């Protein structure tokens, strides 16, 4: 993630639910910028369509340069408040950062491959927390479970990290567990119960 986009933002002069609602109706997202590089929180609005496209392309850990009426701030997404009904973005928290700074982020874990025949995989954790340079935040980590047998587990410690990225997550955090399908387990229990019933009848 060495490159980042520049998005224009406008300073908010009005506050409150009514003001935020009017901004959203006008196609804008209310946002707050905070961090060591800003003396006080900056309240701004950004274009909804432009920002939504950025998230689709770069992910929820995206780094972006915010152009606030000519003043530029390097920021990263810290929190997205999304409407549960419309899925539109209602509000943003953006952290002001510096080049060369390291930050802690939750990075998605993608499972690839198929385990041994007769087994299935269960993903216990969808993300892991790592520390990375703000301009080199991994978009995702891939974990291969190809051919893994029943009982095999993948933990946070097993994930290969890129470059200077370091693991913050507990190394023993379970990511993927290889198990037998629950249906087979239920059928086995039913068979045992039926067998016991037949023996009792005899």
Curated annotation (Swiss-Prot):
Please list the residue ranges that the record marks as compositionally biased, kind Acidic residues: 183-202
InterPro entries with a match to the protein in the record: Rbsml_bL25/Gln-tRNA_synth_N, Ribosomal_bL25/Gln-tRNA_synth, Ribosomal_bL25_b-dom, Ribosomal_bL25_C, Ribosomal_bL25_long, Ribosomal_L25_dom, Ribosomal_uL5_bac-type
One GO molecular-function entry: structural constituent of ribosome
Q: Which GO terms describe its cellular component?
A: cytosolic large ribosomal subunit
Name the Gene Ontology biological process terms. translation
Which residue ranges does the record annotate as region Disordered?
182-202
Keywords associated with the record: Ribonucleoprotein, Ribosomal protein, RNA-binding, rRNA-binding
Q: Which family does it belong to?
A: Belongs to the bacterial ribosomal protein bL25 family. CTC subfamily.
Checking PANTHER family in the record gives: RIBOSOMAL PROTEIN L25/GLN-TRNA SYNTHETASE, ANTI-CODON-BINDING DOMAIN-CONTAINING PROTEIN, RIBOSOMAL PROTEIN L25_GLN-TRNA SYNTHETASE, ANTI-CODON-BINDING DOMAIN-CONTAINING PROTEIN
Give the function comment from the record: This is one of the proteins that binds to the 5S RNA in the ribosome where it forms part of the central protuberance.
Q: Assembly and interactions?
A: Part of the 50S ribosomal subunit; part of the 5S rRNA/L5/L18/L25 subcomplex. Contacts the 5S rRNA. Binds to the 5S rRNA independently of L5 and L18.
Q: Give the matching HAMAP family.
A: Ribosomal_bL25_CTC
Q: What is this protein called?
A: Large ribosomal subunit protein bL25
Name the source organism.
Answer: Corynebacterium glutamicum (strain R)
Organism taxonomic ancestry: Bacteria, Bacillati, Actinomycetota, Actinomycetes, Mycobacteriales
């Amino acid at each position: 993630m060495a490159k980042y986009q520049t998005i224009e933002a406008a300073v908010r002069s009005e506050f409150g639910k009514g003001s935020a609602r009017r901004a959203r109706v006008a196609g804008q997202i209310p946002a707050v910028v905070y961090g060591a590089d800003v003396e006080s929180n900056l309240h701004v609005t950004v274009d909804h369509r432009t920002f939504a496209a950025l998230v689709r392309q770069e992910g929820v850990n995206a780094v972006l340069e915010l152009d606030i009426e000519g003043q530029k701030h390097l920021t990263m997404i810290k929190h997205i408040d999304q409407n549960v009904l419309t899925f539109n973005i209602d509000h943003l928290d953006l952290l002001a950062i510096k080049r060369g700074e390291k930050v802690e982020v939750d990075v998605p874990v993608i499972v690839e491959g198929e385990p041994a025949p007769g087994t299935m995989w269960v993903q216990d954790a969808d993300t892991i927390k790592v520390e990375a340079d703000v301009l080199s935040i991994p978009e995702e980590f891939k974990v291969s479970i190809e051919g893994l047998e029943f009982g095999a587990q993948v933990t946070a410690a097993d994930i290969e990290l890129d470059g200077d990225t370091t693991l913050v997550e507990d190394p023993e955090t379970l990511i993927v567990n290889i198990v037998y399908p629950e249906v087979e387990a239920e059928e086995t229990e039913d068979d045992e119960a039926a067998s016991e019933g037949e023996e009792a009848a005899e």
